[in-house]
C-alpha cells in the first residue's frame, strides 16, 4: 500500500516522523483525511488529535492547534505543543482538567479565555491518552 511521510514538529523539536497510509486531523474548516498523492493544502488546525493509520493500527498525537501543510508525498503538522498518546502524563492532564471551577467564577474575559483553552488542551490530551 502507498504511504505518505508525516512530520509533527513543535518549537522544541520533532515529535513524530514516519510513513503512514492515512492522516486524519481536525482543521478549522472541518475534518480532513489525507492519503498519499493528496493535492497541496495549508490549513489551520483546532486543538485536537491527529490519527495516523499504518499497517492496520492507529496512532494518536494530541496537539494544541497549529498548521497543517500537505504535499503529494508528505504532511507536516506545525504545532505549539504536541504529544504522542503514550507520552502523555495523565495525572498532569487530569489536574488541568479539574481546574474547571475557576472557569465558572472568572469575570475577566482574558482569564476566562486562557482557562477555557487550557481546559480544551487538557481534555484533548486525556482523550488521546485513553486511545493508547
From Swiss-Prot:
It is a peripheral membrane protein. One of its GO terms (cellular component) is proton-transporting ATP synthase complex. Keywords: ATP synthesis, Cell membrane, CF(1), Hydrogen ion transport, Ion transport, Membrane, Transport. InterPro entries: ATP_F1_dsu/esu_C_sf (IPR036794), ATP_synth_F1_dsu/esu (IPR001469), ATP_synth_F1_dsu/esu_N (IPR020546), ATP_synth_F1_esu_C (IPR020547), ATPsynth_dsu/esu_N (IPR036771). One of its GO terms (molecular function) is ATP binding. It is found in: Cell membrane. The keyword Transport applies. It holds the Pfam family ATP-synt_DE_N. F-type ATPases have 2 components, CF(1) - the catalytic core - and CF(0) - the membrane proton channel. CF(1) has five subunits: alpha(3), beta(3), gamma(1), delta(1), epsilon(1). CF(0) has three main subunits: a, b and c. Belongs to the ATPase epsilon chain family. Produces ATP from ADP in the presence of a proton gradient across the membrane. This is ATP synthase epsilon chain.
Amino acid at each position: 500500500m502507498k504511504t505518505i511521510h508525516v512530520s509533527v514538529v513543535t518549537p522544541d523539536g520533532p515529535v513524530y516522523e514516519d510513513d503512514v497510509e492515512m492522516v486524519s486531523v481536525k482543521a478549522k474548516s472541518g475534518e480532513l483525511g489525507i492519503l498519499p498523492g493528496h493535492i497541496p493544502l495549508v490549513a489551520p488546525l483546532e486543538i485536537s488529535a491527529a490519527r495516523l493509520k499504518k499497517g492496520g493500527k492507529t496512532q494518536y498525537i494530541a496537539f494544541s492547534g497549529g498548521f497543517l501543510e500537505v504535499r503529494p508525498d508528505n504532511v507536516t503538522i506545525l504545532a505549539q505543543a504536541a504529544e504522542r498518546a503514550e507520552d502523555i502524563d495523565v495525572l498532569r492532564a487530569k489536574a488541568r482538567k479539574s481546574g474547571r471551577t475557576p472557569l465558572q467564577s472568572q469575570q475577566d474575559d482574558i482569564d476566562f479565555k486562557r482557562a477555557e483553552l487550557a481546559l480544551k488542551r487538557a481534555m484533548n490530551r486525556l482523550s488521546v491518552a485513553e486511545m493508547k
